């Protein structure tokens, strides 16, 4: 069993101030795969002090120096990609094929993208006698989730490092293993002591201590809307910047002119990706009422092709959800959907056939769902798709936007101009037409209760920068 009982503070692996350990469970077996330490406010104080001290010099480093660090990180990351994938598989239950591709390479992609952007990034702008300067904001508190563990670490750390910030990272205590490897990569890449610090722990202790800390200049949080609200409340007394990427209940509008089989197949497969544990999952499929029965049959056929099994096997396409807490929540929502009268097309409560351990969920499709049902309103965060019939395009757009969330939207149409028109009316930060993937060079973030601020690409630099105007910079 792996042991990660130290924290990375000021360039050193150090013991926690007060020893307290937690077992990390492999969700596919329910057995412990690692032991970590849980930090305290005292550990946070040490990490923040190191980051604050390092900021004085690191904020003055050249673009070339920071590009070099990022490029060295990318080189080491690539060399260790197999270890990283295995850590992700163990900590959150991703099938090894997914862990080795989308999960691991997302973390690498944000590093290489940040290096590329930094080479051409403009930190100054002259306006007559005035100069506008973009400067690093300072010490950043970074709190990341378990569902895309290294993707979320990297899309915060890489831009913060690129612009000259220092930071303290609290990864999810449920899935912390890959973050430790990330710290090792930064250390080997020669990132100066104190620039990056890692303290593990839970939200009410380490997360709250970071959010409240007077020497932390900004907080970047990814997770549930409930937890994100608490981070903002804890940060409010010190008036620090807070950026958040939170929950979602994303609509997938199948327009009448779409290739129905391709659109439904794509939508179901996307919903099941990462076992439905993605904040931007297309969890509400909106289908023309007269095409609903055909769409149901297609969805059932796609679901039959899902391969549930051991996460170490290449043939497995769906792993477990991350924890017993998540499994119980998903089961309650599935049972609630049945009680509310939704039609079960496939799946349902309980473990999949042939599975007797692990937090596996039967991939489930509901139909005849109304947008007011709990399964249409709440973020289930599991492999559960709801199909909602509509009678007109206007009604579809109204249903799509009738949610407190606004992270993503999806539009399927055989006419690109038609799809563009509908996409422009969806209140969401990211809209995907006909299955288009998001690019790491475009902003990622949400409207409404899905958060604020943007990550990824050049827009991802903005949250880590302060804007200064210097008047009289040039003689009048």
Report residues per predicted region:
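Short, well-ordered beta-strand elements within core beta-sheets of diverse protein domains
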Residues: 33-39, 53-60, 107, 142, ...
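Residue-level signal for inorganic ion chemistry
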Residues: 30, 66, 88, 111, ...
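Rossmann-like NAD(P) dinucleotide-binding subdomain of oxidoreductase/dehydrogenase enzymes
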Residues: 78, 123-262, 390
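Conserved C-terminal structural/oligomerization subdomain of aldehyde/semialdehyde dehydrogenase
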Residues: 29-35, 216, 253, 307, ...
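A short acidic/small-residue loop/turn micro-motif
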Residues: 15-16, 21-22, 38-42, 258
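Long amphipathic alpha-helix in the N-terminal Rossmann-like dinucleotide-binding domain
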Residues: 49, 71-82, 94-120
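ALDH superfamily catalytic-core signature
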Residues: 226-370, 433
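Hydrophobic face of amphipathic alpha-helices that form TPR/SEL1-like repeat modules
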Residues: 1-28, 114
């Amino acid at each position: 069993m792996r042991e990660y009982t130290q924290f990375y503070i000021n360039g050193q692996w150090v013991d926690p101030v007060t020893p307290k350990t937690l077992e990390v469970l492999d969700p596919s077996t329910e057995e412990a795969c690692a032991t970590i330490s849980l930090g305290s406010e005292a550990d946070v104080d040490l990490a923040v002090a190191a980051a604050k001290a390092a900021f004085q010099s690191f904020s003055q480093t050249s673009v070339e120096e920071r590009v070099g660090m990022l490029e060295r990180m990318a080189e080491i990351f690539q060399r260790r990609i197999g270890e990283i994938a295995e850590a992700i598989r163990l900590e959150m239950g991703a099938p090894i094929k997914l862990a080795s591709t989308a999960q691991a390479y997302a973390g690498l992609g944000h590093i290489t993208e940040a290096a590329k952007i930094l080479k051409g990034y403009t930190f100054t702008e002259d306006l007559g006698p005035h100069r506008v300067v973009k400067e690093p904001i300072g010490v950043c508190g970074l709190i990341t989730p378990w569902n895309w563990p290294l993707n979320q670490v990297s899309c915060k750390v890489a831009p913060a490092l690129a612009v000259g910030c220092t930071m303290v990272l609290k990864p999810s205590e449920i899935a912390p293993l890959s973050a430790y490897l990330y710290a090792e990569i930064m250390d080997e890449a020669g990132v100066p002591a104190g620039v990056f610090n890692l303290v593990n722990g839970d939200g009410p202790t380490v997360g709250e201590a970071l959010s409240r800390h007077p020497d932390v200049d900004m907080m970047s949080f990814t997770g549930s809307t409930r937890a994100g609200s608490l981070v903002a409340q804890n940060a409010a007394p010190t008036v620090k910047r807070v950026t958040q990427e939170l929950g979602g209940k994303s609509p997938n509008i199948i327009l009448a002119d779409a290739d129905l089989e391709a659109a439904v197949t794509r939508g179901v497969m996307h919903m099941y990706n990462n076992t439905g544990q993605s904040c931007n999952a297309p969890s509400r499929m909106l289908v023309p009422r007269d095409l609903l029965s055909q769409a149901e049959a297609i969805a059932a056929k796609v679901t039959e092709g899902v391969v549930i099994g051991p996460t170490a096997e290449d043939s497995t396409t769906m792993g477990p959800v991350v924890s017993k807490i998540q499994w119980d929540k998903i089961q309650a929502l599935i049972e609630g959907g049945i009680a509310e009268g939704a039609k079960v097309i496939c799946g349902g409560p309980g473990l999949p056939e042939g599975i007797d351990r692990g937090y596996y969920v039967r991939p489930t499709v509901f139909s005849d769902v109304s947008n007011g049902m709990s399964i249409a309103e709440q973020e289930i965060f599991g492999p559960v798709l709801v199909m909602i019939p509509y009678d007109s395009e206007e009604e579809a757009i109204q249903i799509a936007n009738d949610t407190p969330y606004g992270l993503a939207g999806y539009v399927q149409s055989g006419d690109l101009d038609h799809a563009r028109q509908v996409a422009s009316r969806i209140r969401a930060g990211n809209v995907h037409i006909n299955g288009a993937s998001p690019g790491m060079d475009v902003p990622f973030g949400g409207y409404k209760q899905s958060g604020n601020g943007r990550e990824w690409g050049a827009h991802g630099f903005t949250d880590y920068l302060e804007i200064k105007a210097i008047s009289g910079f040039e003689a009048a």
